[in-house]
Amino acid sequence: MRTLTILTAVLLVALQAKAEPLQAEDEPLQAKAYEADAQEQRGANDQDFAVSFAEDASSSLRALGSTRAFTCHCRRSCYSTEYSYGTCTVMGINHRFCCL
């Protein structure tokens, strides 16, 4: 029984390792398509939007004395080095708000 559990865990890790590079390769293609759509619609509805951080994220960084700024993007899914700080809406579609 223990051997079956270990083999299953190894199989799941191998599948996950194989799936992550596919997602990383697909991300630039999605970004290019998104940029093309955004450029087409930029002339039709030129709108500004504000980004604000929840108090817990920014105040905790200030309390630690960090001088590093957040770099955030609105994406379908966050990279492994990013954290999701909520959601954002672009052209009526909800995405994750991913920050480094």
Curated annotation (Swiss-Prot):
Post-translational modification note: Proteolytically cleaved by trypsin at Arg-68; the propeptide is stored in the tissue of the small intestine and the mature peptide is found in the luminal fluid; cleavage may occur during or after release into the lumen. The N-terminal propeptide region suppresses self-assembly and renders DEFA6 propeptide unable to agglutinate bacteria and protect human epithelial cells from bacterial invasion.
GO (cellular component) term, any one: Golgi lumen
Alphabetically ordered keywords of this record: Antibiotic, Antimicrobial, Cytoplasmic vesicle, Defensin, Disulfide bond, Fungicide, Immunity, Innate immunity, Secreted, Signal
A GO molecular-function annotation: protein homodimerization activity
Keyword Signal recorded: yes
GO biological process assignments: antibacterial humoral response; antimicrobial humoral immune response mediated by antimicrobial peptide; cellular response to lipopolysaccharide; defense response to fungus; defense response to Gram-negative bacterium; defense response to Gram-positive bacterium; disruption of plasma membrane integrity in another organism; innate immune response in mucosa
Prosegment location in residue numbers: 20-68
Cysteines engaged in disulfide bonds, as pairs: 72-99, 74-88, 78-98
Signal sequence extent: 1-19
Compartment(s) where it occurs, according to its Swiss-Prot or TrEMBL record: Secreted; Cytoplasmic vesicle, Secretory vesicle
Subunit-level organization: Homodimer. Self-assembles into higher-order oligomers termed nanonets, fibril-like structures that entrap microbes. Self-assembly into nanonets seems to protect against proteolytic digestion in duodenal fluid. Interacts with Y.enterocolitica invasin and S.typhimurium fliC/flagellim; the interaction creates an anchoring site for progressive DEFA6 self-assembly into nanonets.
Family membership noted in the UniProt record: Belongs to the alpha-defensin family.
Function: Host-defense peptide that contributes to intestinal innate immunity and mediates homeostasis at mucosal surfaces by forming higher-order oligomers that capture bacteria and prevent microbial invasion of the epithelium. After binding to bacterial surface proteins, undergoes ordered self-assembly to form fibril-like nanonets that surround and entangle bacteria and thereby prevent bacterial invasion across the epithelial barrier.
Protein name: Defensin-6
Species name: Pan troglodytes (Chimpanzee)
Gene giving rise to this polypeptide: DEFA6
